[in-house]
Amino acid sequence: MTPWQQAAADDAALMNDFQAICSFGGRLSGTGQDKAAMDWALTRLREIGPDVRLLSVPYDGWRCLSNGVTLLGETPLHLDCVPLLRSASTDPTGLEGTIIDLGAGRPADFERAGDAVRGKVVLVRHEYPFAPDHVHRRRKYDMALAQGAIAFLIANPVPNAGPLSGS
C-alpha cells in the first residue's frame, strides 16, 4: 500500500464519507442514485462549511438509448446491465459471442489468457479502489480491447447490488 493509500485508510472520517457515497450505488445521472448522493454530499459539506452551493453546468454528454445482455442457451437469461460511459454501439441485431471469465481482470489474468481473449466477450469482476492491487475498470477494458476482445462485461460481486456504471 502506498503512503497516501495508507493515510486514506487510516483516516476514519474520510473512510466513513467514502463508504457513505459508495452506498448510493452507481450514481449514473437520472437513476435517482445521483440525486440521493448529491443530497447527502450537500448535507455533509454544509457540516464542514457554510458556503455550499449546487451549480448546474451545461456539458456535452453521452446517452445510452438501449442496452441488453442475454445469456443464450436452452432457457435464455436476460441480465440487468448498464453500459460503460462512451461504450461503442453494436449493429441493430446486436452481438453474439463466447464469454471468457478473467476473474479480477488483473494484468496477470490477461497475460495468462493470451490469445484466448481474441474474438471473445471478456468478463471481469468489479472491484472498489483503495486496495494495493486495484485495477480500474477502464484499464481492464483497455487490456481486453488490446487483446482482441469483441465485448467487455463487468460483474458486480455484491449480490443484489444492481448493475455498475462508470467509464
Could you say what each language-model-derived stretch is?
Residues 107-164:
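A conserved hydrophobic secondary-structure block that centers on an alpha-helix together
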Residues 1-4:
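Short, contiguous pre-domain boundary segments
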